[in-house]
Amino acid sequence: MEKISIQLSKLRKNFGTVEVLKDVDIAIPEGQFVALVGESGCGKSTLLRLISHLERPTSGQLLIDGKERRKINPSVRYLFQEARLLPWRSVLDNVRLGAKDRDKKTARESLESVNLLDKENEWPEILSGGQCQRVSLARALAGKPKILLLDEPLGALDALTRVQMQKLIESLWLEQKFTVLLVTHDVSEAVYLADRVIALEKGQIGLDREIPLPRPRVKDRHFACFENEILNFIMKNYYI
C-alpha cells in the first residue's frame, strides 16, 4: 500500500470574509512530485503555507505522514521565489542554518549537491540570481526534508538559468526521493517536472492530472497534449 505523505480533507482557509480555499481534498503519496498551477489568487501559495504550518486552516484536516501537527515540522522545508539569504553570513553559514545543529559537514555536502561548494566562503552579494537560489535550495536540503515546498522559486530567473535549475531540482528529487509540491505559473515547467499537475480554480481543485511521461522528458506531441489540456482549462474563462 502506498504511504501517504500529505493528506488534506475538506480543507478551508478564510482571510476575514474572503474564502481562499474551499473544501480541498488531496492525497499525495510519499515521493511524488506535484505541481500546483492556476490563476493568480486561486490559493496556490496559501495551500503551501498551510502545509508548512506558516498558516492555520480555518477548518478541515491536514495530516503530514498520518499525523495532525500544530507546529512547524522540521521535515518540511520551504523555498520561496526570493532566495532570502542573510547578507552578513557566508554562503556556507547560510546553508548551515538549515542543517541540524548547524552541522558544517552536512552543509558542505548540501552545497556540493548543488555544485556550489567552491563558493562556500563567498558572500551572497557576489552571487548571481541563479546561484543564490541554488544556495537557498542547498539550505533547504541540508535539513534532510521529507517534503519540499517550492513557491515559484524559478520565477525571477532568466530562461537558461531556469532550465538548469529545473534539471537540478529533478535530479536531486530522483536521488533523494522526497515529496515535492511546486507552485508555478509555467504550465510547461509543471508538465516537465511533475508526476501530477493540480490546477486550482477559485480555491478549489478544478483539474487533477497524472503525467505518465518517461524521464528525462522530451517536449514532443505527447508532452504538448498534456500542456494544452492544462492550459485550456486555466484559460477557459478568457476565451470568447
From Swiss-Prot:
It is found in: Cell inner membrane. PROSITE patterns: ABC_TRANSPORTER_1 (PS00211), ABC_TRANSPORTER_2 (PS50893), SSUB (PS51291). InterPro entries: AAA+_ATPase, ABC_transporter-like_ATP-bd, ABC_transporter-like_CS, ABC_transporter_ATP-bind, P-loop_NTPase. SMART domains: AAA (SM00382). ATP binds at residues 38-45. It is a peripheral membrane protein. Its main location: membrane. Signal peptide: none annotated. One of its GO terms (cellular component) is plasma membrane. SUPFAM superfamilies: P-loop containing nucleoside triphosphate hydrolases. Its EC number is 7.6.2.14. Residues 6-227 form the ABC transporter domain. CDD domains: ABC_NrtD_SsuB_transporters. It catalyses: ATP + H2O + aliphatic sulfonate-[sulfonate-binding protein]Side 1 = ADP + phosphate + aliphatic sulfonateSide 2 + [sulfonate-binding protein]Side 1. Keywords: ATP-binding, Cell inner membrane, Cell membrane, Membrane, Nucleotide-binding, Translocase, Transport. GO terms for molecular function: ATP binding; ATP hydrolysis activity. The complex is composed of two ATP-binding proteins (SsuB), two transmembrane proteins (SsuC) and a solute-binding protein (SsuA). This is Aliphatic sulfonates import ATP-binding protein SsuB. It comes from Zymomonas mobilis subsp. mobilis (strain ATCC 31821 / ZM4 / CP4).
